[in-house]
Amino acid sequence: MLVLAVLALAGLLAATASASARPVTAADRALLARPATAEEHVAERVAERLTGHEQIAVRCGNTGVPDPHVLGATPMQNGHAFDYFLMRPAECTYLTWFHDAPKRWDPRTCVASDCGYVFEIAWALQTVAHESYHLVGYTNEAQVDCYGMQSIWFVASRLGASVAEAQALAALFAQRIYPLRRTETPAYWSPECRDGGAYDLRPAGHAWPS
């Protein structure tokens, strides 16, 4: 099931997390004006821990980016973010599924009917991490995507996964999804995204990507 899912995913890699260099819009203000949903609170708590920022807002809705395949967006102006990011509603749903039953989505043990969603779960975890690094101030998509991949384990563990499962999800992304970036979405790929590379967040260790 996992191999088939990977092959199907190869044609969908235009679905990427993205930073949008634009100011706050009226649509953003409308989303931010309403209370966060339970799903959005889940993403907010993880993003706050990952960035060290307080009162980050995450909203699920229109990302404000024309490409319908974009999973998330962090509005920025003059290189500065606004301490909020947007995700597609589907990503919030996947995060909630994972938070409610982490073991169900373990790529090593999932049943066939659930394994078909494990890649979507991994994308949702990576989207939170990816956009969080934009909030910190990083704008290079290849660098941000690499950092996000290396933080999948953190997001997964904060949502209740065991260390082993969190690392397995990160490895799944690194081994099965990230290599396809090179040809499908090259702006999000870098040869320095590797153990010991320039974008290695933990060069002293070798448990790549975790």
Predicted ranges, named:
Residues 2, 11-114, 208-210:
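A metal-dependent hydrolase signature that marks the N-terminal structural subdomain at the beginning
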Residues 7-9:
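Regulatory and partner-binding modules of innate immune sensors/adaptors
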Residues 21, 29, 47, 54, ...:
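Metalloprotease/metallohydrolase-associated module, dominated by Zn2+-dependent proteases
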Residues 111-122, 126:
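Intrinsically disordered, low-complexity acidic Ser/Thr-rich regulatory segments
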Residues 122, 126-141, 145-149:
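Active-site recognition of the HExxH zinc-binding catalytic motif
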